[in-house]
């Protein structure tokens, strides 16, 4: 790998009722590039998710903020400025058992379809690193028990 990273994360999940849960997270990471071209940085993260366990689907809506502080000036743009940026991420995910649509294929309802959308907006003190990105994802997952 090109870098060594150490991170710490603290999270708390809270059950409001049978339908609603929340997740709060705080994190810190320190990345050090092996070949040091100014890509050493520290990241501070905070996130909040609210989750809904509806009978017809599981929906999660989240918001996160990440603050990146680089340790060396970026010589590719301006050698006197140390890069610092903040990234705001909004995401929504919907999960549904395939067995709810096709009981013959998944009678135990252990095969899931997941659809998600993520919007990231990053602002830096160096304009070259400002961006807005949208991401869509569709995936399938299978749950199974290792004790059987």
Question: Residues of each region from the PLM?
Answer:
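Gram-negative and organellar
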Residues: 1-148
């Amino acid at each position: 790998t090109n870098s060594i990273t150490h991170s710490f994360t603290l999270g708390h999940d809270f059950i409001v009722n049978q339908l609603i849960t929340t997740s709060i997270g705080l994190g810190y990471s320190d990345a050090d590039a092996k070949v040091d071209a100014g890509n050493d940085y520290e990241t501070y993260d905070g996130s909040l998710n609210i989750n809904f366990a509806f009978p017809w689907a599981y929906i999660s809506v989240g918001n996160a903020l990440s603050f990146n502080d680089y340790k060396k000036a970026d010589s590719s743009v301006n050698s006197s400025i140390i890069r610092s940026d903040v990234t705001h991420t909004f995401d929504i995910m919907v999960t549904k058992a395939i067995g709810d649509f096709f009981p013959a294929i998944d009678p135990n309802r252990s095969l899931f379809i997941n659809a998600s959308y993520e919007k990231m907006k990053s602002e830096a003190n160096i304009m070259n690193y400002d961006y807005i990105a949208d991401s869509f994802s569709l995936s399938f997952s299978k749950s199974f028990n290792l004790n059987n």
